[in-house]
């Protein structure tokens, strides 16, 4: 009996958040260990089903770095990173698109549907949803910078009661294909949709200081200080920059959470203390 009462109390503690966030759009960047470990993958899918059932409109943007690395290695194609971004030549671009749009996207969509969600997998190239140009004059090869998001494609899917699962591949002005950093892709989509939240699942606790302690709340000033002292560097830079762009564009809050923690998404959304870092 006591266990049942405790369960009821836990459910009721989430009620204010369910009421607050019903019918709101949450853009969720899905990547890291949560996308690899079988138990975490299933936990994530169940979390998304719950969000859908309580009326939160989830939009999922996924990465796939580890699987891309694996396929590139099999084909003897090298992986090079500059400023946390994958340098992508023409051969690598074909592998990236095949892996993201053809394999990973459909795996995620199928898993969500298996657990009772209604999800549809799409590429950013579909209906020219994501338009892009070469990032930094081709410094990174076929890595692109999003220039426009056709939000009507996404809203049509959402309004039909479906969850869009988006591969971060975009189309250029000459119909060339671009690889988009998944964090930056999620940021651009959240900004165009004016989402209530954008949430980045990662393999770290959140934003850490130089002593590797979690910082629960940040703003632009504190982020610049962390960049200057080196606490934010490497692959964390595009993630943080993506968060800041969201906030400047009208997104309510940006969260970075540890995807290795079971049900981290629910813990961040439906509890007072959360588990990661929030940027406002």
Curated annotation (Swiss-Prot):
This is Acetylglutamate kinase. Its main location: cytoplasm. The keyword Signal does not apply. It holds the Pfam family AA_kinase. InterPro entries: AceGlu_kinase-like_sf (IPR036393), AcgluKinase_fam (IPR004662), ArgB (IPR037528), Asp/Glu/Uridylate_kinase (IPR001048), Glu/AcGlu_kinase (IPR001057), NAGK-C (IPR041727). GO terms for molecular function: acetylglutamate kinase activity; ATP binding. It comes from Campylobacter fetus subsp. fetus (strain 82-40). The lineage of its organism: Bacteria, Pseudomonadati, Campylobacterota, Epsilonproteobacteria, Campylobacterales. Substrate binds at residues 64-65, 86, 179.
């Amino acid at each position: 009996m006591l266990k049942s009462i405790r369960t009821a109390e836990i459910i009721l503690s989430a009620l204010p958040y369910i009421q607050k966030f019903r019918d709101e759009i949450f853009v969720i960047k899905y990547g890291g260990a949560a996308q690899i470990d079988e138990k975490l993958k299933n936990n994530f899918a169940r979390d998304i089903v719950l969000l859908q059932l309580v009326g939160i409109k989830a939009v999922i943007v996924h990465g796939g770095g580890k699987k891309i690395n694996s396929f590139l290695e099999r084909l003897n194609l090298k992986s090079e990173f500059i400023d946390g971004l994958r340098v992508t030549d023409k051969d690598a671009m074909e592998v990236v698109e095949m892996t993201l749009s053809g394999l990973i996207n459909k795996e995620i969509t199928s898993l969500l549907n298996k657990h009772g969600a209604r999800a549809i997998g799409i590429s950013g190239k579909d209906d020219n949803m994501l338009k892009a140009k070469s990032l930094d004059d081709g410094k990174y090869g076929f890595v692109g910078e999003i220039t426009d998001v056709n939000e009507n494609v996404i809203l049509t899917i959402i309004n039909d009661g479906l969850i869009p699962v988006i591969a971060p591949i975009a189309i250029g002005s000459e119909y060339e294909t671009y690889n988009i950093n998944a964090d930056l892709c999620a940021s651009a989509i959240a900004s165009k949709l004016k989402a209530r939240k954008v949430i980045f699942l990662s393999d770290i606790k959140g934003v850490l200081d130089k002593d590797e302690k979690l910082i629960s709340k940040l703003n632009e000033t504190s982020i610049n200080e962390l960049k200057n002292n080196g606490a934010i560097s490497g692959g964390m830079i595009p993630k943080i920059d993506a968060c800041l762009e969201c906030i400047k564009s009208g997104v309510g809050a940006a969260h970075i959470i540890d995807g290795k923690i079971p049900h981290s998404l629910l813990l961040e959304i439906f509890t007072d203390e959360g588990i990661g870092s929030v940027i406002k």
